[in-house]
């Protein structure tokens, strides 16, 4: 079952990305390094609901 999730920048708090994940394969929260347009650099983004 795929669900929609939002990725939030851990440094500035902006919610920059919307993606999907498979809850069976990844039951824990996802953490990815993505580009933050406000800070203009790659930062850690965490899953929010």
UniProtKB/Swiss-Prot annotation:
Alphabetical list of HAMAP family matching this protein: Ribosomal_bL33
Listed SUPFAM superfamilies: Zn-binding ribosomal proteins
InterPro entries for this protein: Ribosomal_bL33, Ribosomal_bL33_CS, Ribosomal_bL33_sf, Ribosomal_zn-bd
Organism of this sequence: Listeria monocytogenes serovar 1/2a (strain ATCC BAA-679 / EGD-e)
Name under which the protein is recorded: Large ribosomal subunit protein bL33A
One GO term (biological process): translation
Domain of life: Bacteria
Any Pfam family hit: Ribosomal_L33
Keyword Transferase: no
Family named by the database record: Belongs to the bacterial ribosomal protein bL33 family.
Record NCBIfam families: PRK00504.1, PRK00595.1, rpmG_bact
Keywords for this protein: Ribonucleoprotein, Ribosomal protein
An MF annotation (GO) of this entry: structural constituent of ribosome
Disulfide linkage: none
PROSITE patterns: RIBOSOMAL_L33
GO cellular component, one term: cytoplasm
Gene name per UniProt: rpmG1
